[in-house]
Amino acid sequence: MSDSSRIGVVLLLATAALTGVIYAIARPTPPERMKAYGGPIGVLGRWAYFVTRPLLRVAITLRLTANAVTAVGAAVALAAGGFAAVGEWGWAGILLVFGSWCDLIDGEIARATGTQGKAGAFLDSNLDRLSEIALFAGLAASLPDRSASIWAVAALASSLMVSYARARGEGLGVECPNFGMERPHRVVLLMFAMLFAPFVPGAGGALLLEGACAVVTVGASATALGRMIVIHQRLRRQEQGPGGSGPAGSA
């Protein structure tokens, strides 16, 4: 890993610390959709929205569409996967930060300009999955031993199952509740692991990333299983109908 990636990470963390102090002093009202997240993820999410407000205003002034920003974010995430594949984990983490900011801004642009729609949501969801595939594939390619690569592949598989369970449930008319290790949790965990990996001596950086992939595997697998159980139960209740004795409309 290059010294330039370490310098980049230090500058990024210093900027984050400075804006964090400003955020703590300003205490802005959090966006409505961020109120669903609590704990560290909620704090980081509200801070990220605060930091990206100037970028949001610039994007709207330049008349950038939400889909254009979504595409830029996906391209940045793909580049992060490429850097991860060659072992430049610090740069991969930095790019993942900027890609995540694009992921925040695109939805805000759509809401601010009244251009929300199913087509944009479909594009965003698919590019999110592509970004995750690129990131975990890059880690699988660069981690030094077979067990670490297996953890990266397992983390990818379990992450996709979390998304698929929700998508399939909603396709069958069942709303899936938010719980467990969702995409924001996975992204933040990998982001911090990649940002700090360049500073861990020896093989410690690879072990840190392997551990992060293992945590994602366990957490996402449990989340996917929980969603499957919840959605299956709700579908069964729908089939049984109000009386609970059989499919709705049966004699």
Q: How would you label these PLM feature ranges?
A:
Residues 68, 94-97, 101, 118, ...:
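Residue-level recognition of specific faces of alpha-helices
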Residues 101-109, 122, 126-130, 161, ...:
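Active-site His/Glu-centered metal-binding helix of metallohydrolases
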Residues 96, 107-150:
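Basic, amphipathic juxtamembrane/active-site segments
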Residues 74, 83, 90-108:
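Alpha-helical membrane segments and adjacent membrane-interface helices in multi-pass membrane proteins
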Residues 1-90, 135-251:
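Hydrophobic alpha-helical transmembrane segments
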